[in-house]
Design a protein with these regions (language model features):
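Subunit-assembly interface segments of extracellular/virion macromolecular structures
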Residues: 1-713
Length: 713
């Protein structure tokens, strides 16, 4: 506890405290045990789909192909239908609560990192050079920001992802903050969740052992459109022109689905809005008819009936993170000794024999210390190589060998390239470990400005987030804990750090520890070792405003070296750490790239930067997920990250979020397409949503301490 200087009136006396006083208080160590607690898992954003063809490939450790979001219902099994209006990553896929019986069966497609697009039509075309893939586009009036989904290709149409804010028609935009490349917006259309009518993933041949692509329609809920009532009726002519008495459809988006029920028909009609006419009427077109879902044809005679819109069953505002919150805060330790985890795995490249029998064992899953679950419609599905799906029932399923072997009978005979979606119960759970890496460095040598590069020594680049002038500067790795310093060069050379020289015989290059603290006995300065340069010299980053004094005794806090400081070599680089904040990239559904964000009202740097930081690394970990046990106890006080918009303390969760791989490209790492989750540290299995685990844990109890000033001061 730090007590500041001041005067207090105690027992009739004025008591002066001349300087700051530090009082050591034992940390609270009182704990409460929770011997058994249920932890439920939701896992990702649920999009309900039907009319399914094929099976999607999860993206938690494979970014070969994404899930593409389209604005029309499917009409092809090997491409998307309509306009591409967004992208997402697949987490899991399973039947939604009932057995598969055909195209009308609903499935739960669990997604993460869902992004919908904004489409701009510019006043003049942009080339690939002017608008490279992943370019950052900013509206000069609105301040809206987005990243290009593709390069310009001499087109006036630009689609943006990761959009924040709202672009305005007529405003100017600037590309990659280059004032020489600007355009104005002729028209703008913002796509949202309500525009998603189908999904597509180009699995074949991009992903090994997936014989077909994945295609599905979104399940559409009925919604009365704004400005209309449930009793309003639509008048549909044989030509497809539709009106509503006393009402106008102006403002309705094309590709909206109109739902209506005709007399003596058991299946609803679905028609697509192809055009909104100037008189407020709409032109309707057909969609594919799906048994048990919709009749997509236009009526053959004039029809007057009530109607609604069809909107997908998804809500991004209720995004569920890929982690599970434990019941209490300030968890101190966790007991997984009796816990298990229900996980999913696609078994690939299976075949049925001549009798329609398929058998596989635990080795096919690649998961150890597990057994297959008993049959349930949500737990198992069989997807043939031609994209069709087996109507799988419990009498076809045989579990044997203590849950190690599954046999499925009654399949189509002599089929290959079968994908079986399975569910297992994993035991012997283990927390992944995070290694605390100290004093790592990143040099930023790129600039957005093409002039004076001979004076700055930098290279002009277009990738936003990789240049010194950018408001957000990517650290190109995830899970950064703290930034120790940001240093700007004063010339064309790289920035340097202060160096301390000590007497010979200490073998600092082998005996000192990278990242340990050094304390000056006279100056009270504290610094962190950033490099072990030689047997007598180290490089440092100051952690205090006080500086070391030549000749004083300094102490290396971990290696217990105590010696006299012979020489201080100041770098001359500018310390500009205070103009930045750190965004650690702790998103609800994944570990994103950590980044520096320049504070408002500060001018951008003009020369090369050197950034020194500490981070967590999980590259050698072999566990199943992250928990409080993933962190060293000494990190518990200030170095535990907070997850997502609700700032959930990571040590109070079971954390399944995938981690982005290190970035080394030239485009912006902040664009959807440049986030990659192919790191081997990410799990090869998925946590089955809507399941739970039983764990034990302890958590710290709060306490209140009182500091009393007596008359002795």
């Amino acid at each position: 506890v730090k007590i500041s200087a001041g005067t207090a009136y105690v027992k009739g006396f004025d008591v002066d405290i001349d300087g700051t006083v530090i009082i050591d208080v034992d940390k609270p160590r009182d704990k409460r045990e929770v011997s058994s607690a249920l932890v439920p898992y939701q896992m990702g954003t649920i999009l309900k789909v039907n009319n399914v063809f094929g099976v999607p490939a999860p993206n938690i450790n494979d970014d070969t192909v994404f899930v593409e979001l389209y604005n029309q219902r499917t009409s092809s099994n090997n491409s998307g239908t309509g306009e591409l209006v967004g992208q997402a990553r697949c987490y899991s896929f399973a039947v939604s609560g009932s057995a598969y019986t055909g195209d009308s069966t609903e499935w739960d497609l669990h997604l993460f990192d869902v992004q919908t697009f904004t489409r701009l039509v510019l006043n003049s075309a942009v080339s690939n050079t002017e608008l490279p893939d992943a370019s950052r586009v900013r509206g000069l009036s609105s301040g809206a920001i987005g990243y290009a989904t593709a390069s310009g290709s001499a087109s006036t149409i630009v689609k943006l992802t990761e959009v924040t804010g709202v672009f305005m028609q007529g405003e100017q935009v600037i590309i990659n903050e280059d004032p020489e490349i600007s355009r104005s917006i002729k028209t703008v259309r913002t796509f949202g969740i309500q525009d998603i009518k189908s999904v597509y993933q180009a699995c074949h041949p991009a992903i090994t052992n997936y014989a077909t692509d994945f295609v599905a329609d979104t399940v559409l809920q009925s919604k009365v459109p704004t400005g209309f009532s449930i009793t309003d009726k639509i008048n549909i002519g044989v030509s497809g022109i539709a009106t509503c008495a006393g009402k106008s459809f102006a403002g309705i988006k094309t590709d909206t689905i109109i739902r209506y029920q005709l007399p003596n028909e058991s299946t609803e009609r679905f028609n697509r809005v192809t055009e909104v006419l100037s008189d407020g009427s709409i032109s309707l077109g057909t969609v594919a008819s799906i048994a048990g879902v919709c009749n997509g044809a236009l009526p053959s005679t004039l029809q007057i009936t009530t109607f609604s819109f069809g909107v997908p069953n998804i809500n991004l505002n209720d995004n569920t993170g890929l982690f599970a919150k434990i019941g209490n805060s300030n968890v101190s330790d966790i007991d997984l000794s009796t816990a298990n985890l229900v996980v999913g795995k696609n078994i690939l490249s299976e075949s049925s024999d001549g009798n329609g029998v398929l058998t596989f064992d635990l080795a096919a899953s690649g998961i150890s210390s597990a057994f297959y679950e008993s049959f349930d419609e949500e737990r198992y599905s069989v997807h043939y190589g031609d994209g069709s799906i087996e109507n799988l029932t419990s009498d076809q399923f045989v579990l044997s060998n203590n849950g190690q072997t599954v046999t499925i009978n009654g399949l189509t005979a002599s089929q290959s390239n079968i994908v079986v979606s399975t569910t297992l119960k994993k035991q012997a759970l283990k927390s992944k470990q995070k290694d605390y890496i100290r004093s790592e460095k990143l040099e930023v040598t790129k600039t957005a400005v093409g002039v004076n590069t001979s004076l700055t020594g930098m290279t002009k680049a277009t990738g936003y987030g990789l240049r010194v002038e950018d408001r957000e500067i990517s650290l190109n790795k995830c899970d950064i804990v703290k930034v120790l310093g940001v240093f700007e060069s004063i010339d064309a050379n790289s920035p340097t750090l202060d160096k301390l020289t000590f007497p010979s015989g200490l073998a600092l290059n082998t005996n000192a520890i990278l990242g340990e603290k050094i304390t000056g006995s006279t100056s009270e300065a504290i610094a962190q070792v950033s490099s072990l340069l030689s047997a007598t010299q180290v490089e440092i980053v100051y952690l205090t405003s006080e500086k070391f004094v030549q000749g004083e005794v300094v102490n290396f806090n971990e290696s217990n070296i105590s010696t006299t400081l012979q020489e201080i070599t100041e770098s001359g680089s500018l310390n500009i750490t205070n103009i930045f904040d750190l965004d650690k990239g702790q998103r609800d559904q994944f570990y994103d790239y950590s980044r520096l964000i320049r504070k408002s009202n500060f001018a951008p740097p003009k020369r090369k930067l050197l950034i020194v930081y500490d981070r967590y690394d999980a590259g050698t970990s072999t566990g199943d997920f992250f928990t409080v046990s993933s962190y060293d106890e000494e990190r518990y006080g200030k170095d535990i990250p907070n997850i997502g918009k609700n700032n959930v303390r990571a040590s109070d969760t079971i954390d399944f979020r995938p981690r982005v791989s290190g970035y080394s490209g030239d485009e912006s790492p902040f664009a959807f397409q440049n986030r990659t989750f192919s790191s081997s540290v990410n799990s090869s299995f998925i946590v089955t949503p809507n399941e739970s685990s039983i764990i034990g844990y302890n958590y710290y109890l709060p306490r209140i301490d009182k500091v009393v000033l007596d008359d002795d001061g």
